[in-house]
Amino acid sequence: MSDLPPPDLGSEEISVSPTSSSSSFVPIDKNQLQDAVQVVSEAKEFNSLILDYVRKATPASEVNNNYHIVSVFGSQSTGKSTLLNRLFNTNFDVMDESNRSQTTKGIWMAYSSIITTSQGPVPSKGGENIFVMDVEGTDGRERGEDQDFERKAALFALSTSEVLIINVWEHQIGLYQGANMGLLKTVFEVNLSLFGRTKLEMNEHKVLLLFVIRDHIGTTSKESLAATVTQDLIKMWDSLSKPQELAHLQFSDFFDIQFHTLRHKILQPGEFTTDVQLLGDRFTDHKNEDFLFKKYYHHDIPIDGWTMYAENCWDQIDKNKDLDLPTQQILVAKFKCDEILTSVFEEFRSKFEERHAKYAPTDIKEEVDYEELGGSLGDLKEDTLENYDMMASRYNQSVYLQKRKTLEQKITDVYQDLVDQHGAHMVSKLSAKFASSLSSKKLPKDVSFALATEALRKDIVHQFLKNCSCITLNGSLDHAKHVTSFTRKLDSILSKQRFVELNSILAKSLKKVESAVAKAITQEISEPSESTWDRVLEKFKGAQDEYFYSKYETATGVDFGLGTSASVNERALEKFQFRAWSLLHLQMRKLISKDNLVIILKDRFEDKFRYDENGIPRLYQNSHELELNFTAAKEHALKALPILTLATLSDGTTIVPKYDVRDKRLQKKLGAAFDTTGEVDLKDEDVESDTDEEDEDENEPKCFAEAISETDKASVLSKFKKETDATFVESKRALIQHVTHIPYYIYIVILVLGWNEFMAVLRNPFFFTLLLMLGAGTYVLYHLNLLKPAMVVVQRMFDECLVIAKQKLKEFIDEQPQEHAKRLSKMAGITEDKPEEIEMSDLTPPGEGS
């Protein structure tokens, strides 16, 4: 192939090849004729520069699929080249009539710029771009019995052309060799092997066999000649050996047959020209009922792909390999579509990186407009596919569509990375927004938590799906995993918040119940009675009804309005009940502790011992009265002890809680708040070590109703006895001091001896006023029944002053002997011995420091 001269349409020099007819390119009149290029040399070498010829003859981008390939086939020296030159205004070499020999060697092709018609020359450009191939004639003496090239050339023409002109003389009709029937049979057999299986797939492609009958005299009509040829062809087709699966295929499934007659060129030149013009009409006039170009004749390959397709076909034919023409067309389409795909995808990547690098989620600080981003992605994808469609839709449709899907997938892969980044970013951002919005302070107060969160979740999911729809081009990109991840995260956040709210509801309700229970117990223990614990239990249940059951109890159970499951609600109810009973038990233990119980008993004792039924302080006049009241007060105080230490109802039964609040397993299971995932019940073996009987405190109460243990009760009794006994002794001492009084006659003596002083007081206005005030105060105290308490207070003050005076006198008396001894020592000149002081000399040599 290297010795083939390159096409040069701009030069008028003749390039001579020793193996060609005269030259590979023929100089012509450029106003009407076109140069011809040798496609396959007589040495079976394919010219790989055909595309350059096509591009120079007419731009390939303008031709696109708007072209037709016409080949001529027939015996040598039958005027094939002459016919093409006259009809298509080409300039193929023609035979020198003075020397009948082979003119066309190999296969040549030329672009037909003008077609001869009855309306005159019709330009090919802008209409039907026709490329004409002149095939070397058959049955030539130059090749003799070597029919290899003839067969290969016929196969090549059949494989690459839409219309195959079979040039035959009228007198050859009915002959076998003269009409090239033997060669046609070979062509049919190969055609069956090439296209047979594609016909099973409903392939509509056909080849038009246009028989041009030369030197038609008119004695035998064209219809009669056509019938003869058609019968011979069908008979020959039926005689072919076909595979079983192709036996049903008919001649008409592969070929269409048309006929045209030409009168003698020399003897009837005018009629010959007219017949050529009429044949030209059939190539150009779409309205002509005998128009030759049909859509299903075309190979559906753009002109730039056809040149590659033709080269591949010849390579397979020349190497005597099985020629699968559809496969060759597909290979060409694949190569070209891959080339186009690579080009448009590189352009796409460049634009994508330029436009959308700013949308990388790691660099995003401001809010992303996903609608704008999605629109930009969609426009870029659409532009890329349009560019591909414009260039690749000219090729085999199945390959074009397959490669289009490949391009779409490559674009999808690029977009998918961006979608995954934004999807993860949206999951993180919107879930954080959802978690923040779940705060009870931000939710509406007029609806339940479940309804509010459902609406909030719906809005967040709608926003997420809307953003996903924008950037996934209405769902064409995969975002299911992000939707799943997002919904799971929302469910997790919502589940955690539900338990937070549930814990809050339980805590608030229990706090109010605890406050009510503490208040009830505090009120009842001050004045305990047989029905004390009935009232405490009633207030305990009433507080539960008021703060819990009235709000959350329904006909089917409890509902907190949080959207929690029935099982969770049931466990919450169990927790509330257990913790409520635990709080009751805790308040009992707290308010009726050892110290508090001693105080309660002492207060009851003091109230009975020191005050009468009217609340007036008692002033005991004798020991008998004191002892009786002491015993009564003590019994009164101790009546409360069994009531307070054991929660017993008026019917004699003790309070039994619904749950054993002292059970450590239940304390772990029901005593704690819900965790964020919903508490999992503990198994008995999980707390086995915590329920070991050896670890139980002996001082602990044995049951729920016991406020304190028996040991603590004994301690309370002992302490109470000591304190009450101390009170009794104190009162007894005061009574004795009060009973030991001054004799009455002393007052008479004082009155007689101090009469003058009394009169002096009465005559003195100041003293008289003071006396009136004291008298008025005494009168008021008497009428208020406070005289005795006042006297007791005065007596105690006097006693206290007396004690202090005695103490001071004692201190003074103790100091007198010591002071007297010191004065005597001074008068005698006795001094205390003092230690003798001796001064030490400094023995350190002069000039030396310490």
Swiss-Prot record:
It comes from Meyerozyma guilliermondii (strain ATCC 6260 / CBS 566 / DSM 6381 / JCM 1539 / NBRC 10279 / NRRL Y-324). Residues 1-741, 787-850 are cytoplasmic. It is an enzyme of class 3 (hydrolase). Residues 64-297 form the GB1/RHD3-type G domain. Cooperates with the reticulon proteins and tubule-shaping DP1 family proteins to generate and maintain the structure of the tubular endoplasmic reticulum network. Has GTPase activity, which is required for its function in ER organization. Keywords: Endoplasmic reticulum, GTP-binding, Hydrolase, Membrane, Nucleotide-binding, Transmembrane, Transmembrane helix. This is Protein SEY1. GO terms for cellular component: endoplasmic reticulum membrane. The keyword GTP-binding applies. InterPro entries: G_GB1_RHD3_dom, P-loop_NTPase, RHD3/Sey1, Sey1/RHD3-like_3HB.
